[in-house]
Amino acid sequence: DEIFRSMLANPGFEKDFAGTWTRAHYYPSGVESSCSIERDNTVAYSGTYSMHYHVGTAAVTEVSLGTDFRTAVKPNTSYKITLQAKTSAETSAEAKIWLNLGECFATPTWGDIYNDVQKGNILTGPQADWTAISATIYTAANAEYINVQPAVSGTGDFWFDHIIVVEIPGEANALDTAKNAALDSLDAAVAALDQNAYTYWNWALVQTAKMNGINAVKQASD
């Protein structure tokens, strides 16, 4: 089964949340009393359990539970994330289901978190059948961990299951090759310039990029 290839710990919620799914968000503050997040053994895409969100107030703009940056990743590498989601028939027409993905350095504190944004397709309204949400992420040059966090808004009952995170083979090398080719072209153009200061500045950016990845050029150019 593909779930056994998932890099996530507890991808099908067959075990307790403790130590695997612990990063809960309730927005705005104060809506927690009308919401709940729990494992559910009455609804499942595969196995016995799923993750169940109940949202009882329309004031909610986000309820979510994430892995809290426990999944180790390689820098400059592509990963695919897929999950299955469904809702109760009574779920509001305005309800939305999406996936938040974040990256961080070695120490997962707020000062180290970046690229913590919604990724992939968004489901809107009731979803009577299990429906896939899929996203890809290309990790930054200094990324070490990711957070996977299914999120909802609107009232109703929402279930998640079968969350798969896998590396996309070969894509990182292909992207690196393309970036290096572009940098080589820039290097050649820089070498043809006559103005020493301008030439040196661009040459320095190119060399930095080759050593540290394309993000170094973006940062140095800002």
Feature roles, as predicted:
Residues 129, 142, 151-167:
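Extracellular carbohydrate recognition
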Residues 1-6, 170-222:
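Beta-rich interaction/scaffold domains
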Residues 82-84, 147-151:
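Extracellular recognition modules
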Residues 23-25, 61-67, 90-104, 145-148:
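Beta-strand acidic-aromatic groove motif in beta-rich domains, primarily in extracellular
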